């Protein structure tokens, strides 16, 4: 009788541990290192007088001081996996009105990409996650 109870309890405990590990906060600082190059695009999206617009600003030449400030900012923010993250293809429909794209390169090779939206969605390397302070991050 004890063996019959022990097996389901072990399965439930194992499942709970896996859920805790899967849904734990992940740090944005893992996407870039000090020796990587970065490029960023900030976009503001909206409708004015019935016409849709996208105002974008490219940040191509980021100085060392700016990169250090970006790295310390990335260190302060976290994101979380969702149930849909496992099956996502990087698409998101709820953009909000601001987006920030960060591209991280090692020499000329793109190694990581981050697409943050003001709605709280963040796409990292073609997987969709949730980010609580996304608008403040942008």
Residue ranges of model-derived segments:
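Function-determining sites in protein domains
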Residues: 2-138
């Amino acid at each position: 009788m004890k063996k019959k109870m022990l097996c389901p309890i072990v399965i439930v405990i194992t499942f709970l541990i896996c859920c805790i590990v899967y849904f734990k906060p992940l740090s944005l600082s893992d996407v870039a290192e000090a020796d990587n190059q970065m490029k960023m695009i900030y976009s503001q999206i909206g409708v004015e007088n019935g016409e849709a617009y996208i105002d974008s600003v490219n940040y191509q030449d980021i100085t060392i001081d700016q990169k250090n400030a970006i790295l310390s900012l990335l260190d302060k923010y976290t994101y979380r996996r969702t149930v849909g993250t496992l099956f996502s293809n990087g698409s998101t429909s709820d953009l909000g009105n601001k987006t920030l794209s960060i591209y991280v390169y090692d020499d000329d090779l793109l190694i990581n990409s981050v697409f943050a939206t003001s709605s709280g969605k963040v796409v990292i390397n073609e997987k969709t996650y949730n980010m609580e302070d996304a608008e403040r991050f942008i």
